[in-house]
């Protein structure tokens, strides 16, 4: 996919090395992530203060709620990956507790766009 020049998102949740797994290319965007379901505040101590100062274009969110995704946007993340479910209570699959239901996802999109517009405007 990368060699076909297709847009590719790579979450680096388990990547422990300083260098990136592939050389930087225009069609690759890396996402900051902690591969734990769900993550806690303690797991996010190394969360980027400013995504523009990193190799990460965005955040792969495994936190409960939408607050960390919104924080990432406020810190310059251009891409948010968030799990989605129609009903968190319909299964025991661990991803569902941290997934966004339709209303939460809508809030994430609307508030995230508002934050992004304010940043773009220079506020």
Map each language-model feature to its residues.
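Catalytic cores and adjacent flexible loops of soluble metabolic enzymes
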Residues: 1-123
């Amino acid at each position: 996919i990368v060699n076909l020049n297709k847009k590719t998102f790579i979450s680096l949740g388990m990547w422990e090395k300083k260098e990136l797994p592939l050389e930087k290319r225009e069609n690759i965007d890396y996402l900051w992530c902690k591969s734990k379901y769900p993550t806690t505040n303690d797991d996010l101590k190394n969360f980027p203060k400013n995504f523009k100062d990193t190799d990460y274009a965005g955040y792969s969110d495994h936190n409960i709620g939408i607050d960390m995704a919104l924080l990432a946007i406020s810190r310059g993340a251009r891409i948010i990956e968030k799990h989605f479910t129609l009903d968190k209570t319909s299964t025991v699959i661990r991803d569902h507790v941290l997934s966004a239901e339709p209303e939460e996802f809508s809030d994430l999109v609307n508030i995230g766009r508002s934050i992004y517009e304010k940043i773009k405007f220079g506020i």
